């Protein structure tokens, strides 16, 4: 009994673009999982931080740029401080968000990009996140005033 194995060539252009935009050498990642273990938002992500890097290495551009993970990253830098190879995933996630917007690839969660914009604006205004004004800004941007109030 013979088993046929098909080998598919990986398109490295996404890896190269991500490296160029983020300034991070993603080939150094050996999947130790320290970034994911320390990430406070990882339990809410559809793709964990270590898997984002692996998927970039494998050229899975549409899946990465369409994931909620790139939008849920709060850039707390926990991943970068834990990484033995000093890969700053927060900077990578910023670059991936930019690429997602430029390519017009929508996130899985409705209005998640609006939440991210409100988060960034809150930091720009006061140097840190002010939850109340961020929430108001998000509600005004999304025009979604009642869904979280209705049981």
Kindly give the residue locations of the regions a language model identified.
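Ferredoxin-type iron-sulfur electron-transfer modules in oxidoreductases and energy-metabolism complexes
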Residues: 4-21, 44-70, 89-137
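Cysteine-centered iron-sulfur cluster-binding motifs in ferredoxin-type domains/subunits
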Residues: 25-42, 68-87
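Intrinsic disorder at enzyme termini
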Residues: 134-151
